[in-house]
Amino acid sequence: DDKFITTDYLQQCPCLVITAIPGVPAADLSGADLLKAWPSMGQQLGAVHSLSVDQCPFERRLSRMFGRAVDVVSRNAVNPDFLPDEDKSTPQLDLLARVERELPVRLDQERTDMVVCHGDPCMPNFMVDPKTLQCTGLIDLGRLGTADRYADLALMIANAEENWAAPDEAERAFAVLFNVLGIEAPDRERLAFYLRLDPLTWG
């Protein structure tokens, strides 16, 4: 398991310095235990977001990720398993066009809310102490880079859905996460945009 420590340069090449961390994946927790761990998970993600954008040598900005989506779709390589059920029968070019229509607004938002993002903050990548239910760190940093913080938040929220035992747990987790991060007015449309983009960038 890996934990992000810092970025450094080795012979002029950017690299990550990492170390092993203890714990179990948050994906293995029950809904009740995940809810207890959730505030510390939000804090860990917030710690990544607080890193210096100027000192991060990796970037995954929206323009770059949309370019990746264009490439994936052009090769007809979108993995249908990554799509929500309602999108599985939609032509890939239509899915891409839907994202493209929102690009101007989302690019403007990114300019004012750029952070260092984990890139794939799904439940298997949060490590949690099973006794204290405190998050011990994040692993799988292959997509770490500068981006709109909502790209991370959308994935974290969506990927936790299958862990919740009831809808009220999901709503409580949503409120807790944005409270921990100090975001007073969560933008649900912005979250939805990044959920529509993400499946198009794998392939």
Tell where the protein language model's regions lie, with residue ranges.
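Domain-wide signal for the mature, well-folded portions of proteins, strongly enriched
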Residues: 21, 55, 109, 127, ...
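Short glycine/proline- and charge-enriched loop/turn segments
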Residues: 22-26, 136, 154-160
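An alpha-helical support segment within catalytic cores of ATP-dependent transferases
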Residues: 37-39, 43-119, 186-187
